[in-house]
Amino acid sequence: MIVIFLGPPGAGKGTQGKKIAKKIDLPHIAVGDIFRTIIKTSTSEAELINNYVKQGALIPNEIVNQVIKVFLLSSKYKNGYILDGYPRNLEQAKFFEAFIQKPQIKIIYFDVADELLIKRVLGRYSCKNCGKIYNIHFLQPKIEHVCDVCSSSVFDYRKDDNKEVIKKRIKVYKTETYPLIDYYKNSGNFYIVNANKNEQEIENDIQKILKIN
């Protein structure tokens, strides 16, 4: 089974992707994390991608498509996965469908208010060791400065997150992705979750969609 999580930055896709992936025993692929890893390398591709990210612009389709294609060729994804953050527009969706040639896809769209998105994105950070996501407003570690999962005390605050860049990313996202939502609505496998809810409520709604006990 392939599950696609669609939604703007800060909608909660990454948090839910990790939790649901464990429940259905499928890998969670966070496309944003893939590109952040590439950016850390000393290559011309990394520099090019980083320029788009800093401006709040979407990375060109031809770059995204090829990176995802190479990534998904790994044998560990042959039985399915949760794909978080891709495709983001019609061109990417059609490329993806032609590449995978599998009919069993479920698309879940995270619908959330812009004001809440901005607050979530500005407040989020993660454990540098295990990747557990936290938020200064909504989800702090149980013990201050100690990760709940791995007990690390080293955290990563994303440098590309500031209010103006986030607003631009949301605007660009809507322009690019709303036509994709209309496209998927007619697929018969498109679902909407209210991502204004709290983390547990969103997880419960996704479990119902995927029929997880």
Swiss-Prot record:
Q: Which Pfam families match?
A: ADK, ADK_lid
Source organism, top-level taxon = Bacteria
- Spans annotated as NMP: 30-59
Its quaternary organisation is: Monomer.
Instruction: Quote the entry's note on domains.
Output: Consists of three domains, a large central CORE domain and two small peripheral domains, NMPbind and LID, which undergo movements during catalysis. The LID domain closes over the site of phosphoryl transfer upon ATP binding. Assembling and dissambling the active center during each catalytic cycle provides an effective means to prevent ATP hydrolysis. Some bacteria have evolved a zinc-coordinating structure that stabilizes the LID domain.
The UniProt entry, under HAMAP family, shows:
Adenylate_kinase_Adk
Q: State the family it belongs to.
A: Belongs to the adenylate kinase family.
The name this protein carries in UniProt is Adenylate kinase
* Origin species: Rickettsia prowazekii (strain Madrid E)
Q: Which gene encodes it?
A: adk
